[in-house]
């Protein structure tokens, strides 16, 4: 169900934390909720304060409002222009889609991203976009124009190359191969391209064969960096994902409870997983340095490397 809403501001400042230093301080979400239906999505919490959550049915079927009720911010352009045009705005990097995918199914009808990107081009404002949809190719030319003016980072998220598993985990996202086509297409622009290999799901997508296939394809696409991260479970996401496992992979439910006694996976598991990832990234000569391309384009001091993530839960 789509519901149109009005907002008073478009950009949200991210609260500083001691856990990790992000390369951006501002989020822009043109939708609230996401129709891709990824069963591990960390952003399910974003509906809770609206008191719009739907509880699981007695039959145990998923019935998550985050996937079913999508709020469309129809005046996002006006709100965004007001903030970008303010004298106090310093053209900081904006992360587009912090708690939703900006190219989710609703975007095919509303086309808000085209207007947003045109405005970003007018103001020459740097942006980061991560998606699981090849709908972003619709805006290839717009993003290419913006990338000639300032820093643009186009990243895709890939968790598995197994289409059957991907369809189960991420029902309405584009197939994995189509996501890689996005990376290939954007290499003919000045945009930075990246692979977000997250979340890696224990017992489902963490097999070395799957990790190597994804990393090797990213290398073929000549991405500027790859950023892996293991699954983190808390709040609504934890409840939803365990329910998903019970319905689809009951044999690994108990191992998950043991591995995730807290929000993050067991440290021993993570250490071994990142050892494998480090080896594979070295084998395929993939950089884990997220910040280097941004430094080059914007002349900003170094803040973040892949190694910063290895000790943290993503």
Which residues does each predicted region cover?
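Active-site glycine- and acidic-residue-rich loops that bind
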Residues: 134-137, 202-212
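Auxiliary Fe-S-binding modules of radical SAM enzymes
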Residues: 2-13, 17, 209-314
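Short beta-strand segments at enzyme active-site cores
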Residues: 95, 130, 193-197, 226-229
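Conserved Radical SAM active-site core
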Residues: 1-31, 35-155, 159-167, 176-180
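Surface-exposed amphipathic alpha-helices with a cationic face
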Residues: 144-147, 183-188, 278-282
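Conserved strand-turn element in the central/C-terminal portion of the radical SAM core barrel
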Residues: 161-163, 170-172, 185-207, 231-233
